[in-house]
Amino acid sequence: MHCPFCNAADSKVIDSRLAAEGCQIRRRRECISCGERFTTFESYEVVMPRVIKSNGKNEPFDEAKLRRSLMHALQKRPVTQEQIEAVLSDIQLKIRRLGERDVKSRMIGEIVMQALFALDHVAYVRFASVYQDFQDVEAFRRQIEQMQQREQECEKHDV
C-alpha cells in the first residue's frame, strides 16, 4: 500500500480490526520510509449477475433501478426506509445465491414479487400490475384473488 504522505511503496500493518458489522477490515498502517500512520479499509467486491431482458438483450444489474421500482410500488405505504433497505438487500442476496452469471429479468421480477407479498400487499399488487402488464380491472381482481388464496394457504399451514 502506497503511503499517502510520501508515496513510498512499503508500509506495515500495525493493527487490524473488523468494521462495518464484519463487512470490512480496518487496517492501521505505518509507512516504513517516513513513519507516518494511516488507515485503510478492505472489503469484498459484490458481483451481481447480468440481467437478460425479455427482448434478449443483457445489461448490468442496476441497484438504482430496483430501488426505484420498490419505491414506486411502496409510495405512500406504511413502510419504513429501514424495511425498504432490508428488502432491497434481501432481494440482491437471493439473486446472488442463484449462482448464475446471467439472470432473466423475469426471475428477478418473481423474487421482487415474493418480497413485496411478504412486506405489503398493496405494493405487491401495484408492482404486479406493471410487471405483469395488467390490461383491465379483471386482471387486478384475479391477482387479488390469487393473493387471498395464497394467504389462506399460509394461514392453514401456520395453525
Curated annotation (Swiss-Prot):
An MF annotation (GO) of this entry: ATP binding
PROSITE patterns: ATP_CONE (PS51161)
This protein's record includes keyword Acetylation: no
Domain of life: Bacteria
Keywords: ATP-binding, DNA-binding, Metal-binding, Nucleotide-binding, Repressor, Transcription, Transcription regulation, Zinc, Zinc-finger
Signal peptide residues on this chain, from the entry's feature table: none
Co-factor note (free text): Binds 1 zinc ion.
Zn finger region (unnamed): 3-34
A Pfam family this chain is assigned to: Zn_ribbon_NrdR
A biological process term (GO) from this entry: negative regulation of DNA-templated transcription
Cofactor: Zn(2+)
Family: Belongs to the NrdR family.
Name assigned to this protein: Transcriptional repressor NrdR
Annotated organism of origin: Acinetobacter baylyi (strain ATCC 33305 / BD413 / ADP1)
